[in-house]
Amino acid sequence: MAVLTYNNYLRQLLSKYECILAFDTAADFLGLTNGGYRSAAQIFVTKKQNIEGTEQIKIDSFEQIECQEYHGLLCTTVNQTIINLLEQDGDEQVIAESLANYYEENGQSFEALEIPEHLKIRFKKYSEWRYLK
């Protein structure tokens, strides 16, 4: 229920702006995390906009980000979200939950994920639990 409420909040806040949900916000919106409190919605923008309650990450072009429309908002794809989380190396709980939930949703497999070579060591760090069976 909390995720649906948060997603509705994001739609109300961002539906009229040019932006892409990013990082922890994208992971929450896509259901990769188990939810949590976020003081600001993280979004990619091509120019800074006056949107209260957001952390805006400026990028040159939306074309450099793999995204899709999802329930009325542009959001990074699942694969792009996981890559971004690993690159950012931010909240370990968000990264671990995102990988664990992805793994379960995909038949206990990471086979479809495309992790760049430079992130494979970090990916292994956060996914070692799968070998502890």
Model-derived segments and spans:
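Short gly/ser-rich loop at a beta-strand->alpha-helix junction or flexible surface loop bordering the NTP-binding
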Residues: 1-71, 105-108
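Hydrophobic alpha-helical interaction segments
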Residues: 39, 59-133
